[in-house]
């Protein structure tokens, strides 16, 4: 009682002195601290209750299929592996690595979830030989595999305004060593503190005082998370106060696992240009080229060490610093019992293992991406594409794309001043499906400016001629490749009253010639006379069936007075390359959500082919173009084995150089010309054809069959009337025709034999001219 009495007396005596400070403190508490805490509390709960991270949409190339007999070269396979972020570590044991032993590759794939169902990670052995895959086997069992896929290369990313690279993971999917190591290094009392660790703060303060500068931090993982989610980088008292208070509030509302999961996905771990790398999963791909769950202990240690300063310890810029920091973290792993001392010593002896090509492509191939965007924007809005955590699987073939770019660069450089002044574009597709494998919109790879492949519309010249002949050959009762056409001068009055007098490129004419020669040598007069016989309106209607508009119905259409983009020209030739199937050109296979579920699949619906016998006749004729016609240099360049079918094209005054050609697997269309539409000085055969040849010197592909297609038969034809003849008859040529369309009786050859008996006609069969023209 005496004590209480004395205490009351002391309080009464002290009250006049402490009354004002007391009420000031109470006023601050109820007037500021509590309301401010309530405001921060609402902010914390609003953000954390519906914690949604900005995750971009990633765009991928096509998965690389590997099966026996698939065309493949070592250079192409290694290009694919490097482009997809695989590293040659000499072992091929860990996902994302490979090993070469002679002509055999051991590859540890990473697996993927795609619109085709995807594939699990596996180790495979791929043997190459004679320009193709000799075998594919499971590396563990040695059993042959019918088909394997490598996960596709990432070619672009659609970022939102924040430009953040992130891949969301759930806490159970994070390797335990990474979680344990993170707490051992950054916050050993994480499981027990209430958001701030007073002991750690005091310990860090004494350490910093002794050192004379900052050597140790006292922030908890919760405080670091608050900085990333809510605060700026400014160092002042109010920010420190907010950080501490918000950390306490987070700990009061949410359990440790929720906080740790948010940290693992949010922590800043690097930068590439304007893209910031957030979270351990994204950092794993960025620095090591593989998923977080496939990381080695020393790699986890490096990422944990980088939390302290991602820029300062950047392993690509400052490898020595990064190595020292990693080894220090490994020491702490040993100190806390996460690994043994022997393991720590072994891990410290390893190199950093950083991949040189970080997988954060913003837009590797802008010309191709323009087509991708055009095909998906009707199904997905910009917000969904920027922050929807989607995976878009495209049809791009990295080898085809890079080889096409190199082909244009090499060709332009070889042309001297003509190449310097010219621009170029190319489109490469899968011949049988219409899948777009590559698009080049400029001779400068990566140029994000004008996309000539999609947007430049230029006269296609003789590229239109196979379509004119195709319309004629679609009537096999009237026309075949041996039917005579007039390669003779012609003049016509145009709608404006002027006379149009077309000529052949060489300025000559050849009189009556078989259709095959008119196409093979690209004679303008033969094509015009044939087209006028068919009817320009029919040619116009056929071209419009491919979606073309503003087709000029004048006779000049027959020799290419038609403006088209390289992509549109590819659509025309896709019909021929696909054996008469009108396939739309597609650049996207499908779209997958964050759970690996396919939410959109882009499938090409094909019906029965149209005019297939005529298409096969034109294909055979275009193969002769590549043997003895305007594209005969294909054979002399060492590519005769491809049996390619192709056609050159040159517009008036040599303004535009075109070539379209296909093999058994690929169709490629090239254009070269000047942006100012001045003469380029290039024929189809001296510009674009050379680029096509450069592409197919490198691109693995199957030859096109040299035999006439189904429904055709070889026959001796009298080229003076297009009827059946016999071997040895004057003017007889052996050509493919639609089976059953010729009379079985040879007409007129008997009397020629009679004349020969009396020495009146020792003519030999007239071969096709082998002198290629310049078109």
What does each of the following model-derived ranges do?
Residues 261, 265, 346-348, 483-490, ...:
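Beta-strand segments within the central parallel beta-sheet cores of soluble alpha/beta enzyme folds
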Residues 207-235, 290-293, 360-364, 478-539, ...:
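Conserved catalytic neighborhood of penicillin-recognizing serine enzymes
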Residues 394-417, 426-430, 439, 445-450, ...:
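A penicillin-recognizing enzyme superfamily signal
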Residues 191-201, 277-278, 340-343, 450, ...:
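Short, well-structured active-site flanking segments
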Residues 165-171, 247, 251, 307-325, ...:
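Active-site loop and adjoining helix of the penicillin-binding protein/serine DD-peptidase-beta-lactamase fold
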Residues 224-231, 265-269, 289, 293, ...:
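Glycine-rich, acidic and aromatic/proline-enriched surface loops and short helix-turn segments
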């Amino acid at each position: 009682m005496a004590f209480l009495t004395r205490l009351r007396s002391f309080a009464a005596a002290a009250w006049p002195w402490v009354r004002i400070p007391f009420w000031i403190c109470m006023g601050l508490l109820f007037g500021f601290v509590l309301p401010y805490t309530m405001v921060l509390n609402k902010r914390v709960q609003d953000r954390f209750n519906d914690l949604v991270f900005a995750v971009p949409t990633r765009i991928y190339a096509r998965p690389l299929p590997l099966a026996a007999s698939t065309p493949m070269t070592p250079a192409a396979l290694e290009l694919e592996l490097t482009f997809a972020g695989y590293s040659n570590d000499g072992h091929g044991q860990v996902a994302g690595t490979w090993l070469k032993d002679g002509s055999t590759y051991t590859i540890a794939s990473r697996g993927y979830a795609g619109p085709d169902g995807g594939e699990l990670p596996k180790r495979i052995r791929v043997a190459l030989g004679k320009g193709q895959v000799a075998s594919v086997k499971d590396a563990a069992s040695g059993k042959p595999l019918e088909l394997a896929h490598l996960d596709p290369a990432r070619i672009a990313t659609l970022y939102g305004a924040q430009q953040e690279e992130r891949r969301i993971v759930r806490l159970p999917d994070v390797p335990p060593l990474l979680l344990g190591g993170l707490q051992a290094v950054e916050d050993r009392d994480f499981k027990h503190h209430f958001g701030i660790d007073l002991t750690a703060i005091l310990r860090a303060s004494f350490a910093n005082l002794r050192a004379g500068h900052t050597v140790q931090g006292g922030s908890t993982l919760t405080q670091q998370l608050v900085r990333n989610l809510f605060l700026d980088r400014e160092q002042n008292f109010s920010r420190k106060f907010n950080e501490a208070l918000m950390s306490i509030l987070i700990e009061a509302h949410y359990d440790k696992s929720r906080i740790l999961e948010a940290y693992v996905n949010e922590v800043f771990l690097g930068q590439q240009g304007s893209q910031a790398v957030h979270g351990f999963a994204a950092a794993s791909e960025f620095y090591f080229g593989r998923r977080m769950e496939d990381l080695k202990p020393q790699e986890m240690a490096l990422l944990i060490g980088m939390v302290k300063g991602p820029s300062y310890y950047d392993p690509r810029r400052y490898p020595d610093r990064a190595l020292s920091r990693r080894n220090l973290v490994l020491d702490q792993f040993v100190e806390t019992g996460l690994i043994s001392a022997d393991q720590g010593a072994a891990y410290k002896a390893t190199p950093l293992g950083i991949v040189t090509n970080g997988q954060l492509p913003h837009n590797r191939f802008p010309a191709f991406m323009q087509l991708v965007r055009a095909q998906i924007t009707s199904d997905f809005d910009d917000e969904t594409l920027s922050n929807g955590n989607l995976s878009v699987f495209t049809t791009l073939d990295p080898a085809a794309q890079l080889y096409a770019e190199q082909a244009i660069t090499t060709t332009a450089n070889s042309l001297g001043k003509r190449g310097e002044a010219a621009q170029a574009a190319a489109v490469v597709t899968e011949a049988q499906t219409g899948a777009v494998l590559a698009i080049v919109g400029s001779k400068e790879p990566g140029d994000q400016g004008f996309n000539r492949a999609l947007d430049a519309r230029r006269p296609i010249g003789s590229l239109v001629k196979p379509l004119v002949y195709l319309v004629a050959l679609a009537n096999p009762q009237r026309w075949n490749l041996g039917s005579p056409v007039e390669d003779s001068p012609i003049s016509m009055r145009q709608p404006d009253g002027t006379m149009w007098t077309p000529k052949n490129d060489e300025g000559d004419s050849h009189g009556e010639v078989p259709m095959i020669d008119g196409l093979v040598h690209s004679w303008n007069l033969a094509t015009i006379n044939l087209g006028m016989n068919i009817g320009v309106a029919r040619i116009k209607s056929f071209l419009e069936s491919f979606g073309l508009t503003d087709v000029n119905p004048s006779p000049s259409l027959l020799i290419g007075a038609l403006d088209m983009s390289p992509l549109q020209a590819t659509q025309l030739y896709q019909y021929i390359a696909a054996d008469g199937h009108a396939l739309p050109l597609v650049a996207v296979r499908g779209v997958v959500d964050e759970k690996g579920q396919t939410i959109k699949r882009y499938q090409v619906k094909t019906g029965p082919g149209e005019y297939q016998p005529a298409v096969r006749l034109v294909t055979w004729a275009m193969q002769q173009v590549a043997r003895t016609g305007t594209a005969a240099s294909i054979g002399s360049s060492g590519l005769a084995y491809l049996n390619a079918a192709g056609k050159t094209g040159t517009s008036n005054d040599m303004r535009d150089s075109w070539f379209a050609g296909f093999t058994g697997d690929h169709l490629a269309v090239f254009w070269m010309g000047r942006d100012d539409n001045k003469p380029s000085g290039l024929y189809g055969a001296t510009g674009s054809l050379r680029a096509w040849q450069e592409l197919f010197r490198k691109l693995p592909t199957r030859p096109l069959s040299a035999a006439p297609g189904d429904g055709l038969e070889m026959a001796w034809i009298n080229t003076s009337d297009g009827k059946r003849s016999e071997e040895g008859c004057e003017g007889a040529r052996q050509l493919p025709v639609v089976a059953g369309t010729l009379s079985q009786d040879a007409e007129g050859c008997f009397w020629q034999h009679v004349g020969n008996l009396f020495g009146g006609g020792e003519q030999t069969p007239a071969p096709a001219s082998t002198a290629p023209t310049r078109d």
